[in-house]
Regions:
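Acidic, low-complexity terminal tails and accessory targeting/binding regions
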Residues: 83-94, 140-144, 163-237
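Active-site signature of alpha/beta-hydrolase-fold catalytic machinery across serine-
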Residues: 65, 159-163
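Active-site-proximal alpha-helix that buttresses catalytic centers in soluble enzyme cores
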Residues: 2, 6-7, 12-72
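Short glycine-rich phosphate-binding loop at a beta-alpha junction
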Residues: 47-55, 142-151
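Short active-site segment of divalent metal-dependent hydrolases/proteases
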Residues: 11, 156-157
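Phosphate-handling substructures
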Residues: 69-129, 196-199, 208, 221, ...
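Generic structural signal for well-ordered alpha-helical scaffold segments
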Residues: 37-44, 124, 128-139, 161
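Short glycine-enriched, charge-decorated loop/helix-capping segments at active-site entrances
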Residues: 18-27, 91-92, 110, 211
Length: 237
């Protein structure tokens, strides 16, 4: 299965440079609503089977146009909710830069635990477990490779992508997840493949749709690379 990790559109908190965290009622701003509408066009023609989202309002608003267009009822999963930033929640980013913990978040995020909140290592653990669980469930339900969307938050996406890359959490700040961006991971029996990171372009198509199989055709023909293996030298498609 292939998951499209969709970050919510730009929010009213993004606009004023505060850390929204799990604050109730943080909605999309005007640009964010435009981004949500544009997601439908960006994913046109892709066989998306399911949408899973964070319980927070900005994620609900982001997937509403897509869910309506596809006739899907999004599933809410608390495990892909925003980081619980504790007492950092609602504060100006410019003020947080002055906190001693800021340097830890930047340089050793695996050790960062937000005061009154949770640690980034726990965020990665819960989010990766959720994504992999949904991926297995949907693979069984749809008997093979298909696409699904998980609408979540920037640090959550970065943590999941780091896991898929086999990168230590302490390097996850090297990954970017802009508002309304899409990062794509294909999970196989042996390993994940990271197809896109922070895609913000018009259409998301390359490498996402599996080639249709002919009835009775073997999973892998002689001379073909198994789907769970990487092509030595790079893809030839």
């Amino acid at each position: 299965m292939t998951v499209i990790l969709l970050r919510h559109g730009r929010s009213t908190s993004n606009t004023v440079h505060t850390l929204a965290g799990r604050t109730d009622g943080v909605d999309l701003d005007d640009k964010g609503r435009e981004q949500a509408q544009a997601i439908v066009e960006r994913l046109t023609g892709l066989p998306i089977r399911a949408i899973v989202r964070s319980p927070l309002l900005r994620c609900r608003r982001t997937v509403e146009p897509l869910a309506a267009a596809l006739g899907l009822d999004p599933l809410v999963d608390e495990r892909i909710s925003e980081v619980d930033y504790g007492s950092w929640t609602g504060r100006k980013i410019g003020d947080l830069v002055k906190e001693p913990l800021w340097a830890v978040v930047q340089q050793q995020p695996s050790a960062a635990v937000f005061p009154g909140g949770e640690g980034l290592a726990h965020v990665q653990s819960r989010a990766v477990a959720a994504v992999r669980e949904h991926d297995r469930r949907l693979a069984e339900l749809h008997e093979g490779d298909a696409l699904w969307v998980a609408c979540t938050h920037g640090d959550v996406i970065k943590a999941v992508v780091a896991d898929a890359l086999g990168t230590h959490l302490d390097s996850f700040q090297r990954i970017t997840a802009d508002p309304a961006s899409m990062s794509v991971i294909r999970y196989t029996a042996l390993r994940p493949f990271v197809i896109h990171v922070n895609h913000t372009g018009a259409a998301l198509t390359a490498g996402l749709v599996a080639k249709p199989k002919v009835d009775g055709e073997a999973e892998t023909k002689d001379g073909e690379v198994p789907p769970e293996d990487a092509v030595v030298g790079g893809s030839t498609d």
